[in-house]
């Protein structure tokens, strides 16, 4: 018995060292870069030593205005080997702001992905409408009336933000000219709609984080799959057509208890990836 007791510390050490965390892939937002995740990377390394972390260093700053589908396809080339190497263990995605929409595109177009948890950090998942700082930085010389005309013209519709600009008063124009979000939502059906939904449902867990003091995402409830109706009243996720008709799998995911939603007050948009409280309370637990 004494011999076993002497071996116990060694055995515990071996068990502790055998803990292996899933790789984490980070995708940044509009007019930003992988540097926006510097503090978040520190938080993850401290909480889960040994975690392999892959901040996507692509489409930085003004290049983030490139067409959304172009960003999805190029980033997919980068993360595919990471996902493949992870094997059955799987990976986690943390995707911030515009990056959350890019990650939706990745999930829907990768039939063999093994993403365990997708954490969407203050992302305009159901679109953007309103001249917040987010829009003003991207298109500083354009007001909201002009932006509606810019985004709903063939020449400009490939600008990233126009791909998910969603005017609640002009839904038909949104369907016609927004090159990204209607397809992502399967609001416009095509030969790949069924496959996009099937791919999205490979996801094990969806974590939605946003808050009322964001001041950039408009409406802020878009980070929770809510959006304006034609009266500019916010319609929550479960009352959205894409949820009720389960167009891309949102209702199915929710039905199996796979969606967690956090509404966090007091956090400005630029602070989400740098906020240690946000990490400790709403992110860390999902990165096992």
Curated annotation (Swiss-Prot):
Active-site feature positions: 97, 214, 269
Catalysed reactions listed for this entry: hexadecanoyl-CoA + H2O = hexadecanoate + CoA + H(+); S-hexadecanoyl-N-acetylcysteamine + H2O = N-acetylcysteamine + hexadecanoate + H(+)
Signal peptide: 1-20
Keyword Signal included in the entry's annotation: yes
Subcellular location: Lysosome
Gene Ontology cellular-component annotations: extracellular region; lysosome
GO MF entry, a single one: thiolester hydrolase activity
Keyword Disulfide bond set for record: yes
Alphabetical list of InterPro entries matching this protein: AB_hydrolase_fold (IPR029058)
Protein name as it appears in the record: Lysosomal thioesterase PPT2-B
Source organism (scientific name): Xenopus laevis (African clawed frog)
């Amino acid at each position: 018995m004494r011999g076993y007791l002497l071996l116990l510390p060694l055995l515990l050490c071996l068990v502790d060292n055998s803990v292996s965390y899933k790789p984490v892939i980070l995708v940044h937002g509009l007019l930003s870069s992988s540097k926006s995740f510097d503090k978040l990377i520190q938080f993850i390394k401290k909480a889960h030593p040994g975690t392999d972390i892959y901040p996507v260093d692509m489409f930085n700053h003004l290049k983030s205005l490139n067409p959304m589908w172009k960003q999805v396809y190029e980033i997919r080339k980068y993360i595919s080997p990471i996902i493949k190497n992870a094997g059955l263990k799987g990976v986690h995605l943390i995707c911030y702001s515009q990056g959350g929409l890019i990650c939706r595109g990745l999930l829907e177009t990768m039939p063999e992905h093994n993403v365990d948890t997708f954490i969407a950090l203050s992302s305009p998942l159901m679109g953007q409408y309103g001249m917040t700082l987010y829009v003003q930085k991207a298109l500083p010389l354009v007001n909201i009336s002009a932006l509606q005309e810019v985004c709903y013209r063939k020449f400009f519709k490939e600008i990233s933000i126009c791909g998910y600009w969603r005017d609640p008063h002009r839904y038909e124009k949104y369907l016609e000219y927004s090159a990204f979000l209607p397809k992502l939502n399967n609001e416009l059906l095509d030969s790949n709609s069924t496959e996009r939904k099937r791919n999205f449902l490979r996801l094990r867990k969806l974590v939605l984080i946003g808050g009322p003091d964001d001041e950039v995402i408009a409406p802020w409830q878009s980070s929770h799959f809510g959006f304006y109706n034609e009266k500019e009243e916010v319609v929550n996720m479960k009352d959205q057509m894409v949820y009720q008709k389960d167009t891309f799998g949102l209702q199915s995911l929710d039905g199996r208890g796979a969606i967690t939603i956090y509404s966090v007050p007091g956090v400005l948009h630029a602070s989400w990836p740098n906020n240690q409280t946000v990490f400790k309370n709403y992110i860390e637990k999902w990165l096992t």
